[in-house]
């Protein structure tokens, strides 16, 4: 049986298949997750509050003993923070079911058992690995010039899921109880799990588009045992001096991203909103993020290309730097917001930097050889997972410090996030853009352009 090079129609069909199935998977998974977030936080708070009050019957109740008091909120931050950490050890269907089992039987099971959900995520690797797989699939079937647009479209689906999940969750809580969206989301995750089995195989698709002699050369390079493959991955990290700052960017950016998990509790406590109200306010950020992805990021990219005579990779670097600056200003603005109006404006401003991850993914991809893309993204996924391990307890502790010091200090986690993103910017600026040529053995010779 002979291989044939795919036609334009074959290529378009494969691209449509990858985009459609990944979009559905993203939509169902993230709609389910964000549908359950406000009710889950409310259920956690109720469980903590009832446990604390039942265990301290002789303790006179004061202002600090209410469910929105510092004691309950500090414990809620601790539970959510460490839950995030154990989830980074990683996730999916079984862990979500386990979280619901602990909540249903909270009268006999301590709430801290939700931390074990992370152990059930160890099969498969969790969200970073899923994100990495989706990214590699896009890289496999799209040309370099079309990859950024494809990734932006996929992330737009992610944002759309968050936008529609918030009002749906609020409506279900208002009409029934927090348990209704909490359990419906689990059923949606089963649907998403079923969709994952339909994802097409894209490995080798790029090689099919190349001439036979080029494909034979690449396939020869793929032969070898597992040790050789690990050696190649290690060689990429050691020989490509840009890998160190790329790893730092993914590690630290994932830490700052985890601060978003506490926005619901932060805004609810600081401005005395219900969790459903806080989640609806966060929709403003998601709507602004969608505008950023669909309009502002492409417009900024075109503007940079129009005024800059540097390489496309250098222009992508400028896009990452600009997006990073917006994140720094956004986090500081959230931390210092004194009124709900200023807070909403700060959320909208932070959303202007929401394209950083996608921009950085495309920028980093352009810095390696095509056959090193998978190694690059798996390394990035590992760095993000490690960042998730640190972020949960770190931001939980910062939230607790804020509660201990008083409402004026609740923004401490977001001051820290802004400082972390300054580190990200320094790492991005340290990346050197290099032109590539091949030596006699087909290995890249790196020459500095910028």
UniProtKB/Swiss-Prot annotation:
Q: Which SUPFAM superfamilies match?
A: MFS general substrate transporter
Q: What InterPro entries does UniProt report for this protein, alphabetically? A: MFS, MFS_trans_sf
Coiled-coil ranges (or none): none
Membrane topology, record value: Multi-pass membrane protein
**Position of the signal peptide:** none
Q: Which UniProt keywords apply?
A: Membrane, Transmembrane, Transmembrane helix, Transport
Pathway terms, separated by semicolons: Secondary metabolite biosynthesis
Q: What is its main location?
A: membrane
Transmembrane stretches, start-end: 18-38, 100-120, 148-168, 171-191, 244-264, 280-300, 329-349, 408-428
Its GO CC terms are: membrane
Question: Which terms in the Gene Ontology molecular function aspect does this entry carry?
Answer: transmembrane transporter activity
Q: Where in the cell is it found?
A: Membrane
Top-level lineage group? Eukaryota
Q: Which family does it belong to?
A: Belongs to the major facilitator superfamily.
Function text = MFS-type transporter; part of the cluster that mediates the biosynthesis of a highly modified cyclo-arginine-tryptophan dipeptide (cRW).
Q: What is this protein called?
A: MFS-type transporter avaK
């Amino acid at each position: 049986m002979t291989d044939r090079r795919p036609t334009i129609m074959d290529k378009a069909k494969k691209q449509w298949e990858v985009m459609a199935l990944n979009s559905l998977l993203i939509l169902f998974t993230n709609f389910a997750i964000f549908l359950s977030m406000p009710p889950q936080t409310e259920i956690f708070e109720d469980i903590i509050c009832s446990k604390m009050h039942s265990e301290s019957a002789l303790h006179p109740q004061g202002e600090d003993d209410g469910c929105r008091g510092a004691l309950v909120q500090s414990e809620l931050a601790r539970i959510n923070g460490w839950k995030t950490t154990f989830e980074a050890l990683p996730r999916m269907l079984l862990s979500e079911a386990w979280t619901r089992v602990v909540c249903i039987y909270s009268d006999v099971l301590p709430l801290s058992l939700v931390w074990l959900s992370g152990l059930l995520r160890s099969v498969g690797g969790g969200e970073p690995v899923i994100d990495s797989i989706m990214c590699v699939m896009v890289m496999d079937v799209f040309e370099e010039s079309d990859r950024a647009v494809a990734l932006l479209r996929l992330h737009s689906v992610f944002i759309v899921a968050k936008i529609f999940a918030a009002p749906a969750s609020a409506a279900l809580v208002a009409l029934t109880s927090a348990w209704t969206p909490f359990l419906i989301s689990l059923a949606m995750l089963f649907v998403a799990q079923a969709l994952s089995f339909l994802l097409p195989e894209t490995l080798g698709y790029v090689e099919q588009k190349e001439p036979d002699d080029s494909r034979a050369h690449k396939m020869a390079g793929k032969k070898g045992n597992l040790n050789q493959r690990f050696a190649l991955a290690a060689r990429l990290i050691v020989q490509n001096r840009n890998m160190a700052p790329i790893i730092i960017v993914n590690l630290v950016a994932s830490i700052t991203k985890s601060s978003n998990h506490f926005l619901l509790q932060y805004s609810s406590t600081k401005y005395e909103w219900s969790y459903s109200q806080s989640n609806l306010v966060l929709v403003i950020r998601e709507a602004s993020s969608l505008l950023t992805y669909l309009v502002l990021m492409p417009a900024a990219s075109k503007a940079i290309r129009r005024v800059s005579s540097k390489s496309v990779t250098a222009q992508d670097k400028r896009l990452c730097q600009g997006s990073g600056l917006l994140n720094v200003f956004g986090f500081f603005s959230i931390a210092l917001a004194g009124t709900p109006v200023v807070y909403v404006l700060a959320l909208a401003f932070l959303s202007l930097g929401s394209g950083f991850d996608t921009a950085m993914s495309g920028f980093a991809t352009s810095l390696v050889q095509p056959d090193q893309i998978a190694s690059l993204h798996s390394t990035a996924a590992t760095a993000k997972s490690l960042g998730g391990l640190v972020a949960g307890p770190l931001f939980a502790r910062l939230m607790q410090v804020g509660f201990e010091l008083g409402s004026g200090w609740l923004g401490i986690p977001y001051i820290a996030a802004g400082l972390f993103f300054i580190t990200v910017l320094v790492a991005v600026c340290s990346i050197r853009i290099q032109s590539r040529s091949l030596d006699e053995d087909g290995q890249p010779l790196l020459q500095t352009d910028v």
